[in-house]
Structures are given as structure tokens and as C-alpha cells.
From Swiss-Prot:
The gene is tmoA. This is Toluene-4-monooxygenase system, hydroxylase component subunit alpha. Keywords: Aromatic hydrocarbons catabolism, Iron, Metal-binding, Monooxygenase, NAD, Oxidoreductase. Belongs to the TmoA/XamoA family. The lineage of its organism: Bacteria, Pseudomonadati, Pseudomonadota, Gammaproteobacteria, Pseudomonadales. It catalyses: toluene + NADH + O2 + H(+) = 4-methylphenol + NAD(+) + H2O. It comes from Ectopseudomonas mendocina (Pseudomonas mendocina).
Length: 500
């Protein structure tokens, strides 16, 4: 049988759209699941994804990528990455696997929703491949850390995090439930693939792979690079969906979805990626600061993408840019202080050399966060460990599910943004978090953050120990501690004496 060239049949297969006859169009694509906004079927046929592939091509490429990822892992199993890596890098692996691995299965659901309920045939076609991509990512990122479980119980949280009530896991689940499992097909295309994957994770994986290579962890570098090549393809589904909405008079609705998702993604990105780049990664392995990464890879790309589509930058853009300078430093300090509530060991990252680097990258760092670290360092050196460990829980944002933070020092700016809705008082970490809630209160109003649950009596006993048990920690070995066992404080002794 003769093989027809791809160009003869590809457009027909990717654009095939059945005209329903046994059911109505609305029954086939209900608005609640589809999100078509009343745009008729024939309009959605103009959807044109920029990255095209066929099933035979997909299978061939994926087979090669899987063979490469698993063979590199097998070849490097004797490299003793765990034993030879800096503890800060090991913490990077733990936080990544716990926050992302099982979340990939939520992404399978999102891609499946587009594959079934999107009116655009091109979207359904690409989402089918995206669904298989995300399944692959989940399997890879559960298999790779499994070998470390026998050496370190915290690696078991690659699987357990999403099955727990740990605060960072709650934050991640709340976000992914919002932009994936709790949204219609077109909202998923915009909020997941455009705002989160194209805007954040696609670029982050490039940076993470580079950092892994610098740290000598070629197994993880190869894994992340393999995943990123999938992301770069299926992340392209949101752009054409936005373009189609704009062309059919739905620009305002499209803009709002983008604005909501970018902010939600940013807050989670700041707490998971910012500390990794500026504090956990060993100083000699840092290729650039988190701020430099954001401006080089994220900000410019978002601006170009939005302008090309005919959308505006989000109304909070100036607040976003200010956040890039400040937010993750405060998040890092909070995570380190409440380290017992994390499934990884936060690295302080504040030796004299690291502080010089932070001051160079973020002028004024020493006058703000540095002052707090001075007090922490002094307490550690004087064996006042009770003053560098928590006794209760912090205030937590009802949107991001992350503790409320501000800038310390002379620029102290902590502010709580509250809202009373249906007789309940909600607290938010920023004006934008509150705005997101107001756009869709039904989506968020019944959720209780970790502190809400504590105050409602769901956590017993009402102590830090009770909270740790509620979060799912089964032993002290699983609870976070300082990654370097406070060895960094000894390096600060000469500087502290000179200051005194």
C-alpha cells in the first residue's frame, strides 16, 4: 500500500469536525465544560495551533526521548549524586518533585478536558498528545526520585505531598484545582497552557536544567530537558484560543482569564523557584539571579506574547515588577523559619559571600532582609535555638494559601487586604489576590486555608505538633531542618564580631 506524504492528509485529520445529528451542538459541547462562550462550531474550526505533529511522529519521538532519559539515569546511578551534591541542591530536588510530580496528573485531566470538550478540532487533536505528555511527566518524576527513598524519607513526599494537608501542598493543589480541574476546556487552554506553561514552567525548566548541569546532576538535567521539549509543544494551545476569542468579540473575557492566571501562577512560582535560584543553589553554580532570570525569560516573553495577541499587560503589572525584587526573599525567610512544616530542608543561603552576592543582585538587601538574618545568626551562634523555631502558625492568604509577608527593615510594608463575603472574613496577601477572589467568589468561597482549619478546630491538638501531624508528617526525619545544620552561621562569626 502506497504511503501518502504527510502534506496530503495532515490538515484533513487535524481539522476533522463532526456535525452532530443525534444530539444538539450544546449537548455535545456544554458551555460549562467547553467554555465556548456562544461562539459557533464553524468559527472554532479556524483554530490554528503553531506546533503540529501526527501520531506516528509523536510515538517515534517520544520513544527516543524516553530511551534517552532512562538510559542516562541508568548510566549515572553509580555517580552518587545524593552523596556528592550540596544539601541545598538535594533540597531543590525534594521541593520540585513534591510540588510537581503528582500535579502532572491534574494536567492530564486538563488536557483530557480540552481533548473532549473543546469545540476547536485542532485543540482537541493537540490536547490528546498533551494528555499523553503529562502522563509521561508524572511517571518520570515519580520514578526518578524513588531510588532516593531508601536514603532519605523526604523523597517519599514526591508521592505523598498531594495526598497530604501540608501547607505548600495545599497551595499547589488550590492553584492547580483552580486553573485545571475546576475550569472549562477553553479556560484550561488559557490559564494552564498560555499563562502557566508558556509563561512560567516552559522557561523555568530551561533554567532548572542549566542549574542541574552546573551542580553536576546530569540525571535531573536530562530529565527536565526531556520534559521541557514536551511542554514547548503542548503549551502552544492557549495562544490560538485567545486569538479566536478576541476575533469573536470576547477580548474582555480573555483578558480577565489571563490576568487571573498570571498572578496566581506568579505567587506559587515565587515561593518555589525564587528561593531555589537565590538561596538553595550553591553560590558557585548560580548562573543568574531569580530577578535576572525573570526579566530575561519571563517578563519579555509575556509582554511580546500579549502585544502580539492584541491584549494589554495585566492592570497590576507595576506591582508584579516590584514583587520580583522583593517577594521571594520574604517567602524564603518564612519557609526557612517554619522549616519543620516543609518536606524538604531549606538552605539559609546567607554566608558572608552569599550575602555579598545578594546585595550585588538586589541593592539594599542587607538593610532589609539582612537585618533579620543578623538577628537569626546571632541567636544561632548563642545557641538560642528556641528563637529561630516557630511555636505557632503564620497568617495565610485565602487565595495563594501562602503566608502573608512584607519587606522588613526601614521599608516595612506588611499590609493585609481583607474582604467580607457572605458573612465570612477573608484575608489576602495583596490587592491582586483579593481582586482574583472577587472575579469568581463561588470558585473560592468555601475553601479553608491551613489556619482557617486550625481555628475551626479541625487540627487537634491545637499546637504546632498537632498541626504537623495534621499535615501528614509521620516522623521527625521527614520534617524540614536547616539544610546545612547551621554550618553557615559559623562562617558569619568574623563578620558578626567585626560588626559588634
Amino acid at each position: 500500500m502506497a504511503m501518502h506524504p504527510r502534506k496530503d492528509w495532515y490538515e484533513l485529520t487535524r481539522a476533522t469536525n463532526w456535525t452532530p445529528s443525534y444530539v444538539t451542538e450544546e449537548q455535545l459541547f456544554p458551555e460549562r465544560m467547553s467554555g465556548h462562550m456562544g461562539i459557533p462550531l464553524e468559527k472554532w474550526e479556524s483554530y490554528d495551533e503553531p506546533y503540529k505533529t501526527s501520531y506516528p511522529e509523536y510515538v517515534s519521538i517520544q520513544r527516543e526521548k524516553d530511551a534517552g532519559a532512562y538510559s542516562v539515569k541508568a548510566a549515572l546511578e553509580r555517580a552518587k549524586i545524593y552523596e556528592n551534591s550540596d544539601p541545598g541542591w538535594i533540597s531543590t530536588l525534594k521541593s520540585h518533585y513534591g510540588a510537581i510530580a503528582v500535579g502532572e496528573y491534574a494536567a492530564v485531566t486538563g488536557e483530557g478536558r480540552m481533548a473532549r470538550f473543546s469545540k476547536a478540532p485542532g485543540n482537541r487533536n493537540m490536547a490528546t498528545f498533551g494528555m499523553m505528555d503529562e502522563l509521561r511527566h508524572g511517571q518520570l518524576q515519580l520514578f526518578f526520585p524513588h531510588e532516593y527513598c531508601k536514603k532519605d524519607r523526604q523523597f517519599d513526599w514526591a508521592w505523598r505531598a498531594y495526598h497530604s494537608n501540608e501547607w505548600a501542598a495545599i497551595a499547589a493543589k488550590h492553584f492547580f484545582d483552580d486553573i485545571i480541574t475546576g475550569r472549562d476546556a477553553i479556560s484550561v487552554a488559557i490559564m494552564l497552557t498560555f499563562s502557566f506553561e508558556t509563561g512560567f514552567t516552559n522557561m523555568q525548566f530551561l533554567g532548572l536544567a542549566a542549574d542541574a548541569a552546573e551542580a553536576g546532576d546530569y540525571t535531573f538535567a536530562n530529565l527536565i530537558s526531556s520534559i521541557q521539549t514536551d511542554e514547548s509543544r503542548h503549551a502552544q494551545q492557549g495562544g490560538p484560543a485567545l486569538q479566536l476569542l478576541i476575533e469573536n468579540g470576547k477580548r474582555e473575557e480573555a483578558q480577565k482569564k489571563v490576568d487571573m492566571a498570571i498572578w496566581r501562577a506568579w505567587r506559587l512560582f515565587a515561593v518555589l523557584t525564587g528561593p531555589v535560584m537565590d538561596y538553595y543553589t550553591p553560590l558557585e553554580d548560580r548562573s543568574q539571579s531569580f530577578k535576572e532570570f525573570m526579566y530575561e525569560w519571563i517578563i519579555g516573553q509575556f509582554e511580546r506574547s500579549l502585544i502580539d495577541l492584541g491584549l494589554d499587560k495585566p492592570w497590576y503589572w507595576d506591582l508584579f515588577l516590584k514583587d520580583i525584587d522583593e517577594l521571594h526573599h520574604s517567602y524564603h525567610m518564612g519557609v526557612w523559619y517554619w522549616r519543620t512544616t516543609a518536606w524538604w530542608n531549606p538552605a539559609a543561603g546567607v554566608t558572608p559571600e552569599e550575602r555579598d552576592w545578594l546585595e550585588e543582585k538586589y541593592p539594599g538587601w542587607n538593610k532589609r532582609w539582612g537585618r533579620c538574618w543578623d538577628v537569626i545568626t546571632e541567636n544561632v551562634l548563642n545557641d538560642r535555638m528556641d528563637l529561630v523555631s516557630p511555636e505557632t502558625l503564620p497568617s495565610v492568604c485565602n487565595m495563594s494559601q501562602i503566608p502573608l509577608v512584607g519587606v522588613p527593615g526601614d521599608d516595612w510594608n506588611i499590609e493585609v487586604f481583607s474582604l467580607e463575603h457572605n458573612g465570612r472574613l477573608y484575608h489576602f496577601g495583596s490587592e491582586v489576590d483579593r481582586w482574583v477572589f472577587q472575579q469568581d467568589p463561588v470558585q473560592y468561597q468555601n475553601h479553608m486555608n491551613i489556619v482557617d482549619r486550625f481555628l475551626a478546630g479541625q487540627i487537634q491538638p491545637m499546637t504546632l505538633e498537632g498541626a504537623l501531624k495534621y499535615m501528614g508528617f509521620q516522623s521527625i526525619e521527614e520534617m524540614g531542618k536547616d539544610a546545612h545544620d547551621f554550618a553557615w552561621a559559623d562562617k558569619c562569626k568574623p563578620a558578626m564580631k567585626k560588626s559588634a
